[in-house]
């Protein structure tokens, strides 16, 4: 369980987050959906302990979150792999147990990168590097995976492929995944829950995706949901709502 209570944050005189409250159940994929500059990435960094809020608290399994730690793993739009280390060694970074190249290769198979362990990041495409990031998340088994526009810089084919692999990653782990995006289709396909945000990170609305629809991109229910979200997105109401439990 992640409990976010009365988070406010400002940079100088500019308040980025007004008063954010949310409870997130363990093992869900939750998406913060909103336009650029609404504060969603700032909120993600606060949840991960990478940024101290002006006020308010974040608790993960009742433990106050104030600093980065191995229980939270961040995946960015642009990879943060170390260029002088091969893929196996990048995956091992920060791991609290020994893991052989063969064991890592078994994980790399899940993201179609088997036998790439001795390769260096510069030899991989952007999509491959993001697949390494997903593999690292699977190996490290954090409690929370935070993803800030992880697929935004990729072409459509690679993006769809990685979306499918992200869904598989979530099925094979107990991690809670929080995704930041401004892409409505990506949010609908990946999420158990969508939090639609306006300026100041104010919650406009929230949606639960019915699992019976199995993330079928052409499902009529999901198409109706998409139209509903697009309408709310366009209206961009900024009124804060009470704390949600999801």
Regions from the PLM with identified roles:
Residues 134:
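Hydrophobic anchor residue at the start of the ABC signature
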Residues 48:
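Helix-to-loop junction immediately C-terminal to a conserved catalytic motif
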Residues 33-35:
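The feature captures the beta-strand-to-loop junction immediately N-terminal to the Walker
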Residues 56-68:
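Conserved ABC transporter NBD signature motif
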Residues 122, 140:
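Conserved signature/switch motifs of ABC ATPase nucleotide-binding domains
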Residues 99-116, 167-168:
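Conserved ABC ATPase "signature" region
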């Amino acid at each position: 369980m992640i409990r976010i209570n009365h988070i406010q944050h400002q940079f100088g005189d500019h308040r980025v987050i007004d008063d954010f409250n949310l409870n997130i159940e363990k093992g869900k994929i939750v998406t913060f959906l909103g336009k650029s500059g609404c504060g969603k990435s700032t909120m993600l960094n606060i949840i991960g302990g990478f940024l101290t809020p002006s006020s308010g608290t974040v608790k993960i399994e009742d433990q106050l979150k104030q600093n980065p730690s191995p229980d939270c793993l961040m995946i960015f739009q642009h990879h943060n792999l170390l260029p002088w280390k091969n893929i196996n060694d990048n995956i091992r970074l920060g791991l609290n147990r020994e893991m052989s190249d063969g064991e890592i290769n078994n994980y790399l198979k899940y993201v179609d990168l088997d036998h790439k362990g001795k390769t260096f990041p510069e030899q991989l495409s952007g999509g491959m590097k993001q697949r390494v990031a997903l593999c690292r998340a699977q190996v490290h088994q954090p409690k929370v995976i935070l993803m800030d526009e992880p697929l935004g810089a990729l072409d459509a084919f690679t993006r769809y492929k990685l979306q499918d692999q992200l869904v598989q990653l979530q099925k094979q782990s107990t991690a809670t995944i929080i995704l930041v995006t401004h892409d409505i289709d990506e949010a609908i396909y990946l999420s158990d829950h969508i939090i639609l945000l306006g300026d100041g990170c104010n919650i406009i609305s929230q949606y639960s995706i019915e699992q019976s629809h199995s993330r079928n991109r052409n499902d009529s229910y999901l198409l109706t949901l998409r139209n509903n979200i697009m309408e709310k997105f366009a209206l961009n109401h900024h009124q804060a709502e009470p704390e949600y439990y999801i």
